[in-house]
């Protein structure tokens, strides 16, 4: 399985970037309205498009959008637990003080579906459902 993917690596990476860019373009108006934040890629940097996420204004917004997507057959998931609060981090890590930025992002970040065979028309439907969910929160 891995060798088959490696032999198609360039095609897979190009397709993932194409889908990532589709999300990025379609979500721009929602970011301009201040309803969410999209990933920021600094000038001169490249990425491989392996995930697409949005950052919502609050944990309530994230959970509401995640539930709205689920009700419409779309799986969006929270992306990460901060390392310092993970079971291993709590056991082995050393944290000096509170980490409000890390903890805040972990509660507001929502990862959207992205895989090589996802179609742009499906991304359009996902973005439409995000927009509908945000309208319900207004």
How does the language model describe each region?
Residues 1-138:
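PLP-dependent aminotransferase class I/II
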């Amino acid at each position: 399985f891995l060798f088959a993917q490696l032999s198609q690596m360039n095609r897979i990476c190009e397709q993932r970037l194409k889908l990532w860019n589709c999300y990025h373009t379609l979500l721009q108006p929602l970011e301009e309205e201040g309803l969410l934040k999209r990933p920021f890629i600094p000038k001169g940097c490249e990425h491989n498009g392996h995930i697409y996420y949005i950052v919502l204004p609050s944990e309530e917004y994230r959970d509401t959008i995640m539930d709205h997507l689920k009700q419409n057959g779309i799986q969006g998931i929270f992306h990460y637990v901060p390392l310092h609060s993970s079971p291993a981090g709590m056991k082995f890590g050393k944290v000096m003080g509170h980490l409000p930025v890390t903890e805040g992002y972990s509660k507001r970040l929502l990862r959207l579906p992205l895989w090589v065979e996802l179609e742009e028309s499906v991304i359009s439907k996902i973005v439409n459902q995000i927009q509908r969910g945000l309208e319900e929160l207004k």
